[in-house]
């Protein structure tokens, strides 16, 4: 199956059902005749900007990150930071962003797209982003940017 078709089906499943884990998504895909590995589904989730969010019942589920056509990278970053970042801390010239579980890679991708001059690079895990800035002053400036997005 082609990637575009698989991603279309993933989007359809996530919009129609409350899917909580990658394993559950893989199972749902198999039920409709689509075989995909965990690595493939993980890549699709990242590429499609799928994030984990809290449903009305408080349970965590996958959702398509809202991206209006033509929305700038800065606006996408602002929305993802506001929705996902739960706290941050600075260690000298490194800023650590803590996100909702499963959302760090999406926020990190948007940070990379925006390419702030004070940011040398980012590394993302499941719920943590390490942002390496060029100096302690740049780290403070970056924190101010993020705080302005949240508040």
From Swiss-Prot:
Statement: the UniProt record of this protein carries the keyword Repressor: yes
Primary location class: cytoplasm
One GO-annotated biological process of the protein: regulation of arginine biosynthetic process
SUPFAM superfamilies in UniProt: C-terminal domain of arginine repressor, Winged helix' DNA-binding domain
GO cellular component: cytoplasm
Keyword Lyase: no
InterPro entries linked: Arg_repress, Arg_repress_C, Arg_repress_C_sf, Arg_repress_DNA-bd, WH-like_DNA-bd_sf, WH_DNA-bd_sf
Top-level taxon: Bacteria
Gene Ontology MF annotations: arginine binding; DNA binding; DNA-binding transcription factor activity
NCBIfam families from the UniProt entry: argR_whole (TIGR01529)
HAMAP family attached to this UniProt entry: Arg_repressor (MF_00173)
Family indicated by similarity: Belongs to the ArgR family.
Record's protein name: Arginine repressor
């Amino acid at each position: 199956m082609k990637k575009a078709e698989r991603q279309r089906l993933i989007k359809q499943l996530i919009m129609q059902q409350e899917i909580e884990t990658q394993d559950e998504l893989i199972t749902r895909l198999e039920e409709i005749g689509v075989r995909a590995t965990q690595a493939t589904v993980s890549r699709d989730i990242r590429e499609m900007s799928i994030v984990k969010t809290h449903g009305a019942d408080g349970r965590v589920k996958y959702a398509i990150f809202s991206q209006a056509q033509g929305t700038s990278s800065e606006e996408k970053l602002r929305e993802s930071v506001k929705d996902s970042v739960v706290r941050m801390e600075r260690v000298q010239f490194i800023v650590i962003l803590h996100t909702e579980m499963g959302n760090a890679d999406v926020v990190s991708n948007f940070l990379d797209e925006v390419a702030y001059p004070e940011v040398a690079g980012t590394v993302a895990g499941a719920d943590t982003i390490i942002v390496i800035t060029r100096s302690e002053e740049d780290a403070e400036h970056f924190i101010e940017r993020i705080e302005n997005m949240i508040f």
